[in-house]
């Protein structure tokens, strides 16, 4: 849940969503251009972290890098 909270804290306050996590419109309306991160439908694929720009008009690459670093650190702590 820490990762979800991080996404929520980074999200743009000017955007309204139905949940604490940035939601994306996949119908092509580009409503959430400033959204932080766009996962696949229902968070089905955690391996697809690179597909954040499918429903958002870009601009979230920095947050993607931060997530990757955070996940990497957690894995190292578990291994050692």
Curated annotation (Swiss-Prot):
Q: Organism source for this protein?
A: Dictyostelium discoideum
Specify the protein name.
UPF0512 protein Q
Q: Which family is annotated?
A: Belongs to the UPF0512 family.
The lineage is: Eukaryota, Amoebozoa, Evosea, Eumycetozoa, Dictyostelia
């Amino acid at each position: 849940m820490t990762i979800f909270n991080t996404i929520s804290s980074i999200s743009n306050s000017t955007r309204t969503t139905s949940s604490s996590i940035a939601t994306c419109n996949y119908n092509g309306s580009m409503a959430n251009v400033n959204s932080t991160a766009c996962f696949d439908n229902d968070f089905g694929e955690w391996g697809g972290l690179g597909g954040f720009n499918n429903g958002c008009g870009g601009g979230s690459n920095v947050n993607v890098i931060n997530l990757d670093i955070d996940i990497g650190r957690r894995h190292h702590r578990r291994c050692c």
